[in-house]
Every structure is written in C-alpha cells, then in structure tokens.
UniProtKB/Swiss-Prot annotation:
Signal peptide limits: 1-26
NCBIfam families to which the protein is assigned, alphabetical: POMP_repeat (TIGR01376)
Lineage of the species this protein comes from: Bacteria, Pseudomonadati, Chlamydiota, Chlamydiia, Chlamydiales
Membrane topology: Peripheral membrane protein
Pfam (any one): Chlam_PMP
Sorted UniProt keywords: Cell outer membrane, Cell wall, Membrane, Secreted, Signal, Transmembrane, Transmembrane beta strand
Family: Belongs to the PMP outer membrane protein family.
Domain Autotransporter intervals: 636-930
Protein name: Probable outer membrane protein pmp8
Length: 930
C-alpha cells in the first residue's frame, strides 16, 4: 500500500533525513478490537514481529488496547517489531493504547530496528502509552524505539506516562530514536513522569529532531533524564517551532553531572543548535539540573518568542552551585534571544548549593568564549532579566548589538531590554551577586531601550549607543565597561526610583578608556507618580549621576551635560518646577547633584474632581424637573381640589471636554402634592419630592446623592381684555376675549452628597457635602381654542417664561491619605424659555394629549467652580465643570387620562438638548380629585 506522504510532511528543514527514511510501499496488516489484549487474567500476549523490506503498515479498524502484556513473565520481544523495513500504524480515527508492558530488555510498545527505517503513528484520535515499560522493568529500554525516524503526525490526543529506560546505557524513557518528528497533532500531547538512566527522560534523538505545527498544548512534566535533558535529550541540531503552547515543569537531570533540567542539546565534538520559535506560549517552570542549565543546556540556542515566554523558578546545583539557573550555553556556544510577538521573562531562577549562599539568582550562564548573538525585542515587546546573567572569565570579542534586525526581516526591533533587581526578596537583596550581570562582550545599542532598574549593575567589555536609542537608568544602577570605552548619545534617568543618596553610575575600568555623553540628561517618570510625590512640594537636592574613569577625570567628556544638564521636561501633571545642577570633580570622577525648585501644581485628571461643581448642575436638573411636573399637574383635566403622587426618573449626561471628564447624573424618586382651585379659577399647588441619585465622571469618581425638594405653584387666569392695550377696532375686541394664563413657582432643594474617589495609585478617598438650591419661575401663556372638529390640536398655548436657579455647594474636606479640601461654590442661571404647548382633547373631554416645544436662552450665568487643595501639601487648583451651552431646545409630550370622575392618570416625557449635554426625564402619576 502506498503511504500518503503529505501526512508526514513537517515544517522544519531539519527533518529532511526523516522523510527520506519513510518507505513508499509496505504490506498492510489489520488491527481490530479483537486484537486487543488484557493480561490481568493470566493470558499471554504474543509479540508481533515482521521482516518486510517494503515495511509493514498496521491499519486499525476499531479501538485497540494492550494491557498487562508480559505480566508475570516478560515478553520475548517488543509488542510490535519490524526488523527490515519501516513500521507504520495508521489509526483511521481510532484509539490505540498500551498500559503496563514488560518486554524485558526490549522496547515496550513498538520498534523499528533497521538503520534509517522509520516508526510512524498517524491518524489516531488517541494514543496512550502508560508504564510500557514501567519502573519495575529493570532492563527496560523505552516505549518506542527507532533506528531511523520516529514520526507522530496528524493525531489527536497523545499521552506518554510513567515509561522508563532503566538499562544503564539507554537513552529516552518514552522515545529513543535517530530522528524525530512530532507534527500536525491537534489535541494535547503530554509526557509525564517518564525517566531514563541517561539522556532524555521523555525523548531522546541522536540526530535531527522537530516538534512543530501542533495545535494542542504540549506538556512535559516531572520527567527525569539522569545525565541530561529531563524531558528532551538531543545530540544534533533540533527545532521546536510553530506550536500552540508548550509547558515544561518539574523535569530534572539528577546525575552528579546532570545538565539541562528540561532540554539538553549538546554533543562532544559537535556544535548542535536548538531552535525554539513561533510558539504562541512557552513556559519553563521549576525544572532543575545539577551542573548546568536548570531548564536548558545547549551548545547553541536560538529562541524567538511568538507569545509570552517565561522562565520561572528553575534551578541548577546541588551540594555546589551549578551554572545557569535557567539556561546554560556551552563553551564557544551561542545564544540568540528575540522577543518578536511576546515578552521573554526570567524570574526566580537560581543557583543552589548546601553552603552559603544557598541560593543565588541567575538566568543565564555563558561558557568560555560563548557569546550572545542577538538580544532584541520588537516594538512593544520586552525581555525582562529579573535574574542576572553570568559569564565565564573568557569572553568573546564579537560585538553584541542590542535590537539589531535581520537584513531580511520586516520587524522593527525597538523594544526594551530590562535588567532589574526589583523583584528580589529582602534577603536576596543583601547579596551583590543577585544584582550583577556580566557579559564579556562589547555592547552596542542600535535601537529601542536598554533599561537598568532596581539597583542592578551591568558589566560589559565596552558600550556604544546609536542615535535614537535610549539608555534608561534608575538611581542606584551602574553601567561598567571593563576593557573598552563608553559612548552615550541619550541617557534617561528614571525618577520613579529616586531615593536616599543613590546615583546613576557610569564607569570605565580600562586604562585611559573614555566616557562620552553628547546630550543633556533626560528625566523620565516611568511610574507616572514622581511629580505627584509630596516630597517634591519643597525644594530638595539629590546626588544624581557619577561618571568615573579608571585613569583621570580628563577621560570624561560630558560638555553637553555641563552646558545644559537636563532637557526641558515634557509637560506633566503634579508639582511643577525645574532642575538646577551643580558639579563636583575629583581626580577620576565627575559628579552631578540636582536641585529641584518647585513653582506650582497641575493636578492630574484623577485629582481634579470636577464632579463636585458638576453636582450643582445635577441639582439644577432635579429642581427643574420638579417644576415641569408641577406645571403639568396644573394642566390636569379636572382643576378642582385634589391630591396627587408621581414617580419620576431623570438622566443628565454631558460629554468630555478639554480637561473635564464626562459627567453623568441619574436620579429617581417620588413626588406627592396637593392642588386647589378657588372660585376665580386660580390654582394653588404644593408638592414635596425625594430623589435618590448617582453621579459619575465615567472615570474614577462616584457620588451618591439624596435630594429633598419642595415647590409652591400659583396660577391665575385672566383675559387680555383686562389689560391696557391700544385700540385696533374689531381686532382689539377679538383679542380681549383671549384667555391669559399667568403662573409663578417657587422651589427649594436640599441635596446630601457622598463621594468616593477610587484612585488607581493611591488609597480611596471619601467626602460628603450638601447643596442648597432655589428656583423661581414666572410665566404667561395665551389660550387659543379651536372647535372640537378641528384636525390635529384644539388648544394652542404660546408661552413666555422667566426662570432663575441658584445652587450653592458647601465647603468640605475629604478623609483619606490623599484627601482634598474643597471651598464652596455656586451656580446661577437665568433663562427665558419661549415656545408653544399644543393640546388634543378627546371628544368626551375626558382625555387629552399635549406636546410642548420651546427654545431656551440663558441670559445670565455664573458657572460653578470650586477651589480645591491637597490637605497633605497645600497645593491647590480650581475644579471647573463644563460650561453648558447657553441655548437649549426642550421638547415634551404628556397625557392626562380620566379613569373616573375623581381619578386621573398622567404621564410625561421630556428631552432637553444643550450642545453636548442631554437631559431626559419621565414621570407617571395618579391624581385624586374631590
């Protein structure tokens, strides 16, 4: 049968020998569920051995399992063996499992024993190999063995668990092979608790290996390769590429010379390279070895991150400290780290020993003459060294160019390389070795940022910087060149770590080696909070930068810095001011001391608190709503005495503008009132209202309000004929009969506010205050009635009003570490609405429908503002709210529905537009007349 080669193709060119070893033809043999075996009852499994030069292909026609084969008496051979050609298993979507196999000194499950002949598993929904052989098989030699290629392709779930290679000279607890391909598998692949006496607790490959294009998670956990490669042992250039997710955890290399807790890729006399690239997620956690590479030991390692990549809590050492807490590079080897589409992080990796110090932080060890060829991060990505790099005393002369792109790469390597001691514990911070990274190479910074943080020291042979790149250093950090010069074009000092007498230190150790800085210092606040620190409310002096040359201060060239010490700071929030510099020279050093001079304060958006004056507009909205409802109740169908109650909801929103955040006010509540009409058809109404509100700036502030309101409404009906007017003959006679409706309204509100400010970087603050508001409305309208038969509306009521609202905010102080004090403020708004009310009356005169349209012009306004200050420092500013548009359009629609001679149902909805501000309210009420 012809084997479909497209099923076996893999992405890496490293596996070409594998493809050449796959036979094109072979004899088919069927495996059906009847071929399953369970030796628990004492039956004996007969191994299947073939010798076909064209190979053997087992094709499954159902799920097959082999359990307890060799129980009691070891099998005479591997469960499946091909001694001449290729051995292939085609799953057809079925599952194949081996559980507890004892094949003596043979491979447990399957073997292809002829040189360069392949062993292949393809097309299975599930492959499972458990204890085949297990730990009790003293002479066991792996689960799968191939003298040529071993291929696991296009399968679903794969599990290798508790498989061992106990034979003293055998590698690979689960798999031992010449070349390896694990590719195109679609579900999880798990290697757990496998072990080998030599290399590769899970997998060993003597030639090219490729693990690529697998879309499920690959897990290598708790495997043990005693001499090296707790999970993977490779002795030739190999690749792990384009996989979805890889997780290496708890793998160990336990021999006294054990290397590579998770992966070993090395061979005496050869220079193999391990390539790890294109994987969407990669984690090495809590792996360990004895001598080199807690996670990886390799001659060459090319690691490119296509997603988050983490080396965490790996360790190397035993009675004596090892080399490379996470990664060890062999003598004359090379390391390339590229954060292309995800960060690379080294955190908590250590060298351990039984003597003090028992634990020392370390990320990478570079052997004698080993070098880093690439150290780069794409734009927006970073490489974090929270653990230092160590190097053999013999370094490499090759220049390490940080963030250097490939000649044919479109990637912009302008990311950040970070060396930091910020995540050391208090005990770890006592050891200088936990802060010091040593690279025995000259460094050149081509692009992006090299950042030194948390008191670290970076020792290199020499350092040069290209225009456009940034060297960022926190006070307390040091850049040291041991043999060559330092040349800087842009030095940025991170003020967020400014403390005590710590300075940025630049030092050369080579005789007559120079230090050059061609531009002023640039100050950066990476935390965003330095200029908010109250310690700089007053002038202070701080040692900031020290340049030290090995021979003489004359080797220090910082003329640009002496002329203009600090670039003009970018606009920032917080305390405003400027820096002044003084310089002191010794025979070998030049030291700069900076003095901060405070000139003012510019609050950041979190502190401005425009919600406080905005709350007056919220009170304005609520009291205006009450007046609208009072007017609507005066237009009820039955004007006699009555009691009424109404529920109402208000919504006020204004957009963000300039430095002011958006503001939203919502309130809801109830109104109860009473009305009476005298014999002259004058209407008297009084009402009480309680509203519950929420105010937000759509940022970090929330205010809860309780509003109590009362209103008195008066309406008087007259005729134009009662007013003095010029005579126009018959027109005057007609005008005299038009009803004139005059009204007046006086309202008051008391609002209690409780504000919470949830800062992003400071403790929460609380404050409470009250608003007191009064409103006056005077108006008049004409009542023009048409016959009932008129279409559309029968009543037309053009009106003109004068409205005045005064609202005052009480002064108050917040509670909390970052509390503010607010002076009182007030709002005055006088407006003249002009419009028309249209009324439709039902034929039985029991129901009506009204529409009102009005233009509102504000003729006078005092916009609210509040003087605000920080209680801890006295810094102050004015909290302003957005000034609403002075022209508005108001539209409302309402109805009165008579349910009985004494009961009336009413409802109204209104919308007011003021530029970028919107006010909505709705109410529904019930009236009882008597």
């Amino acid at each position: 049968m012809k084997i479909p080669l497209h099923k076996l193709l893999i992405s890496s060119t490293l596996v070409t020998p594998i493809l050449l070893s796959i036979a094109t033809y072979g004899a088919d043999a069927s495996l059906s569920p009847t071929d399953s075996f369970d030796g628990a009852g004492g039956s004996t499994f007969t191994p299947k051995s073939t010798a076909d030069a064209n190979g053997t292909n087992y094709v499954l026609s159902g799920n097959v399992y082999i359990n307890d084969a060799g129980k009691g008496t070891a099998l005479t051979g591997c469960c499946f063996t091909e001694t001449t050609g290729d051995l292939t298993f085609t799953g057809k979507g079925y599952s194949f499992s081996f559980n507890t196999v004892d094949a003596g000194s043979n491979a447990g499950a399957a073997a292809s024993t002829t040189a360069d002949k392949a062993l292949t598993f393809t097309g299975f929904s599930n492959l499972s190999f458990i204890a085949a052989p297990g730990t009790t098989v003293a002479s066991g030699k792996s689960t799968l063995s191939s003298a040529g290629a071993l291929n696991l392709t296009d399968n679903g779930t794969i599990l290798f668990s508790q498989n061992v290679s106990n034979e003293a000279n055998n590698n690979g607890g689960a798999i031992t092979t010449k070349t390896l391909s694990i590719s195109g598998n679609t579900s999880s692949i798990t290697f757990t608790s496998n072990s080998a006496k030599k290399l590769g607790g899970a997998i060993y490959s003597s030639a090219a290996a490729s693990i690529s294009g697998n879309t499920g998670q690959l897990v290598f956990m708790n495997n043990k390769g005693e001499t090296g490669g707790g999970a993977l042992g490779f002795e030739a250039s190999s690749s792990i590429t384009q996989n979805s997710s890889l997780f290496f955890s708890g793998n160990t290399a336990t021999d006294a010379a054990g290397k590579g807790g998770a992966i070993y890729c090395e061979k005496t006399g050869e220079t193999p390279t391990l390539t790890i690239s294109g994987n969407k997620s990669l984690t090495f956690a809590e792996n360990s070895s004895v001598t080199q590479g807690g996670a990886i030991c390799a001659h060459g390692l090319d690691l490119s991150a296509a997603g988050p990549t983490l080396f965490s809590n790996n360790r190397c050492g035993n009675t004596a400290a090892g080399k490379g807490g996470a990664i060890a590079i062999a003598d004359s080897g090379s390391l390339s780290l590229s954060a292309n589409q995800g960060d690379i992080t080294f955190l908590g990796n250590t060298l351990t020993s039984t003597s003090a110090p028992t634990s020392t932080r370390n990320a990478i060890y570079l052997g004698s003459s080993a070098k880093i060829t690439n150290l780069r991060a794409a734009q927006g990505q970073s490489i974090y060294f929270y653990d230092p790099i160590a190097s053999n005393t013999t370094g490499a002369s090759d220049v390490l160019t940080i963030n250097q792109p490939d000649s044919n790469s479109p990637l912009d390597y302008s990311g950040t390389i970070v060396f930091s001691g910020e995540k050391l514990s208090a005990d770890e911070a006592k050891a200088a070795d936990n802060f010091t990274s040593i690279l025995k190479q000259p460094l050149a910074l081509a692009s992006g940022t090299l950042a030194l943080k948390g008191n670290v020291e970076l020792d290199v042979n020499g350092f040069t910087q290209t225009e456009g790149s940034t060297l960022l250093m926190q006070p307390g950090t040091k850049l040291k060149a041991d043999t060559e010069a330092i040349s800087l074009t842009k030095l940025v000092v991170d003020l967020s770590a400014l403390e005590g007498n710590k300075s940025v230190s630049i030092e050369t150790a080579g005789a007559n080696k120079t230090i050059t800085l061609t531009s002023p210092l640039v100050f950066q606040d990476s935390s965003g909070n330095f200029y908010e620190s109250h310690t700089i409310n007053q002038a202070f002096t701080q040692p900031l930068v020290v340049f030290t040359a090995a021979t003489a201060a004359s080797d220090i060239y910082i003329d640009a810095l002496l002329t203009s010490p600090v670039q003009t700071p970018e606009p920032h929030y917080g305390y405003q001011g400027h820096w002044e510099a003084t310089w002191a020279d010794t025979s070998t050093a030049k030291s700069g001391t900076m003095t901060w001079v405070t000139t003012g304060y510019n609050p950041n958006p979190e502190r401005r608190a425009s919600v406080v004056p905005d709350s007056l507009w919220a009170s304005f909205t609520d009291i205006r709503t009450l007046q609208q409802i009072m007017t609507s109740q005066a237009n009820s169908i039955y004007q006699q005495r009555g009691l009424w109650a109404s529920g109402t909801a208000n919504f006020f929103h204004k957009d963000k503008s300039g430095t002011n955040q958006a503001f939203r006010h919502k309130s809801y509540g109830y109104i109860v009132g009473g009305s009476a009409e005298d014999f002259s058809e004058n209407i008297f109404s009084v009402a009480f209202c309680q509203l519950f509100g929420k105010d937000k700036d759509l940022f970090i502030v929330e205010n809860t309000s309780h509003n109590y309101l009362a209103s008195l409404y008066l309406q008087h009906r007259a005729f134009l004929g009662g007013l003095p007017m010029p005579s126009f003959g018959s027109i005057t006679d007609m005008l005299k009969d038009i009803p004139l409706i005059l009204n007046a309204q006086l309202s008051y509100s008391y609002t209690k506010n409780d504000m919470d400010t949830r800062y992003t970087s400071y403790p929460e603050a609380q404050g409470s205050w009250t608003n007191n508001s009064g409103a006056l409305e005077l108006g008049g309208s004409l009542a023009l009635y048409l016959p009932k038969e008129a279409p559309f509306f029968q009543g037309y009521f053009p009106f003109l009003k004068f409205q005045a609202v005064y609202s005052r905010q009480q002064n108050f102080k917040e509670s909390g570490a970052e509390a503010r004090a607010f002076d009182d403020g007030d709002l005055v708004n006088c407006s003249i609405p002009v419009g028309i009310r249209l009324e439709k009356i039902s034929e039985d005169e029991k129901n009506n429908f009204e529409i009102s349209l009005a233009y509102i012009g504000d003729v006078y306004r005092k916009n609210p503002r509040s003087r605000t200050s920080l209680m801890v420092s006295g810094a102050s500013w004015t909290s302003l709210c957005k000034n609403l548009a002075r022209q508005a359009f108001l539209a409302s629609a309402g109805s009165h529905l008579t349910l009985s001679p004494h009961v009336e149902l009413s409802g109204e909805a209104a919308y007011e537009l003021r530029g970028s501000a919107h006010i909505y309210n709705v109410d529904c009420g019930l009236r009882y007349s008597f």
